[in-house]
Amino acid sequence: MKLSRRDFMKANAAVAAAAAAGMTIPTVAKAVGETTNAIKWDKAPCRFCGTGCGVLVGTQNGRIVASQGDPDSPVNRGLNCIKGYFLPKIMYGKDRLTQPLLRMKDGQYDKEGDFTPISWEKAFDIMELKFKNALKEKGPTAVGMFGSGQWTVWEGYAALKLLKGGFRSNNLDPNARHCMASSVVGFMRTFGMDEPMGCYDDIEEADAFVLWGSNMAEMHPVLWSRMTSRRLTNAHVRIAVLSTYEHRSFELADNPIVFTPQTDLVIMNYIANYIIQNNAVDKDFLAQHVNFRRGATDIGYGLRPTHPLEKAAKNPGSDASEPMSFEDFKTFVAEYTLEKAAKMSGVPEDQLESLAQLYADPKVKLVSYWTMGFNQHTRGVWANNMCYNLHLLTGKISTPGSGPFSLTGQPSACGTAREVGTFSHRLPADMVVTNEKHRQIAETTWQLPAGTIPEKVGLHAVAQDRALKDGTLNAYWVMCNNNMQAGPNINEERMPGWRDPRNFIVVSDPYPTISALSADLILPTSMWVEKEGAYGNAERRTQFWRQQVPSPGEAKSDLWQIVEFAKRFNVEEVWPAELVNQKPEYRGKNLYEVLFANDVVSKYPLSEIPDDQLNDEARDFGFYIQKGLFEEYASFGRGHAHDLAPFDVYHQVRGLRWPVVDGKETLWRYREGFDPFVPKGEEVRFYGKPDGKAVIFALPYEPAAESPDQEYDLWLSTGRVLEHWHTGSMTRRVPELHRAFPEAVLFIHPLDAKARGLHRGDKVKVISRRGEVISLVETRGRNRPPRGLVYMPFFDAAQLVNNLTLDATDPLSKETDFKKCAVKLERVVA
């Protein structure tokens, strides 16, 4: 789609149309000129990161012609980042997929054939055959799905019902496993409930901010702008930034800290020791609200059991812990002295002490922010727990301006992956498949026979790759992600399983990504406002939007695909006789009828949708399926501190932060006066735990799974850049963003480059024990690694940096460590 300057000028002048829709257009747009009623404006959350910025979408003749920041959004207040301003263009890439494509040869499916257009009916025919064969031959463990933190709430919920309730397989996991799983397990271990207790309002309340492994300036730029305003307009405010290399967030740092990879664990134990030694502990808070426990150590690295590191581990994968006293904890952290921390981390003592003083000062309200630097870590859960330790020791938690806060990278990693429970071990509202009571709640809510949901945890993301390679997972559906590019160790652990003739791989995507082109069947998928949706952002804010434009060609939403596919399976084909006998009324019914068209999900008629806002899925299925799915899903959490507002409310507001009780959202959880679930007089109650107390864990430093040695002499860290989002499958199709950062480069310290005879712009081969990739040397620019470390973004499909990375994971969260592996460099001679 080509939009002229005149088109954009007209769109931005559409004040009258926006006003008619109850929207506010920024003053700058009001000054553009003449208005037009031909453009319709409506609200939506942004499609990119987990900040949850509000956007106004302008549509005309079935196309998006403009977008701008929503000034009525409390998140971004009319501001978007550079990606947000180009949202319309992600929809209209020249290679947008509009038909199902199957690998075929001589008119038949062939694993080595060419992609050939087919109908949806034929696409589902081959999918049905492959899934039924896998179920018949090997059972529910032979089928699986890899979903997304970009799924809408009801897409994730429908997938959860189909996989765990329909196919009876817990082999459902989201790509959020690669980014937020350590945060999830960390919150659950310490507080018994997932997600931050604070909100973005903390930014305007805090006196200090500490960024742990978070480049907010590029990855969460709108929140960074709010923090920048707070820092520059209040002289007393301080910012500390910790990372293994310098990046743009360092430009505002009062205390810029570059540390040796993995030693963030040492630094946090030092800070805990400093707090105790300087009598900065909030003793009353600890006595009333905190327990102490010693965690298991030497827990391995989440590699295959045959790997030498796993064989050597004393307690591989152990989440065990035992009670301890405050005095025991004091003794434990005492060994993490300032001198030891400085020596191990490479950080000057004065910088470490300055950082510790921020946490220790009772007059300083402090927020800790982190993203992938903490979570993509072989001890990511520990890192999360250790950060909570600092806030619990000082009582700086669950109060305006103070608290630990994990920032999410996807628009609904919280709302869908975490809250809906699309992980292999989870169910909605923090319930888990290993808990019999939780399974019973789900089975009752879904009207399923007792015993339908398996109690064994399914395959997580990396385990799915291994099972595909081993031939034990044979029918596999990937939706709304590009894991062939984004996941670790492509050469050894992913590509072999995808191309194994025993396996059938389906990818649903709007574009021909690396993942799509590696699959056997590609299903064209609707994007963003081509469907009605809901996302949940990092501050627990649930936001809705209406379908605003049609999908191109034959593209269908993930929701439609999941629900329509359910029609292909009768209960007798997927459930054993003993389950069917419990529900004889289900005999002859298919999973669509049992899970979706069941008078619970299907009880909301089309008449509840405004005439001009009917969405494609509701029209196709004949009922307001989004409302039915949402209300059923919301029933899991209501009354249990996961309360969501009624469905219709969300279409009228700019999101609400749960728990929502009596129409009021909750800004700070666990604190009396803010949280309706804290009884009067208790002040603070961490009610996720049976005794209402959070846990401080004693956890040590343990080394990375792979470190530089004489041959592979450099650390490699991977990540993102401002202009591109994840694998670039959307942003690289925006000409302006592509031109701004057209290809990946290898950021390296100038002296490391010089020592290897490399110059800026040279081609260089980056080699690990698992693979190699050719990139370009960059010794200047926004990212400035220290000596001994190189940094490379993963957005470039022509430079698959995950050919290099190790599939080591945190043994507790199963999240991959993309920040630490060992590489060497070779100059490429032209």
From Swiss-Prot:
Substrate binds at residue 794. Mo-bis(molybdopterin guanine dinucleotide) binds at residues 83, 150, 175, 179, 212-219, 243-247, 262-264, 372, 376, 482, 508-509, 531, 558, 718-727, 802, 819. The keyword Iron applies. [4Fe-4S] cluster binds at residues 46, 49, 53, 81. Residues 1-31 form the signal peptide. Its EC number is 1.9.6.1. Predicted to be exported by the Tat system. The position of the signal peptide cleavage has not been experimentally proven. One of its GO terms (molecular function) is 4 iron, 4 sulfur cluster binding. Gene3D superfamilies: 2.40.40.20, 3.30.200.210, 3.40.50.740, Dimethylsulfoxide Reductase, domain 2 (3.40.228.10). Keywords: 4Fe-4S, Electron transport, Iron, Iron-sulfur, Metal-binding, Molybdenum, Nitrate assimilation, Oxidoreductase, Periplasm, Signal, Transport. GO terms for biological process: cellular respiration; Mo-molybdopterin cofactor biosynthetic process; nitrate assimilation. It is found in: Periplasm. Its cofactor is [4Fe-4S] cluster; Mo-bis(molybdopterin guanine dinucleotide). One of its GO terms (cellular component) is periplasmic space. It catalyses: 2 Fe(II)-[cytochrome] + nitrate + 2 H(+) = 2 Fe(III)-[cytochrome] + nitrite + H2O. Residues 39-95 form the 4Fe-4S Mo/W bis-MGD-type domain. The keyword Manganese does not apply. NCBIfam families: NAPA (TIGR01706), PRK13532.1 (NF010055), TAT_signal_seq (TIGR01409). Belongs to the prokaryotic molybdopterin-containing oxidoreductase family. NasA/NapA/NarB subfamily. Catalytic subunit of the periplasmic nitrate reductase complex NapAB. Receives electrons from NapB and catalyzes the reduction of nitrate to nitrite. This is Periplasmic nitrate reductase. It comes from Yersinia pestis. The gene is napA.
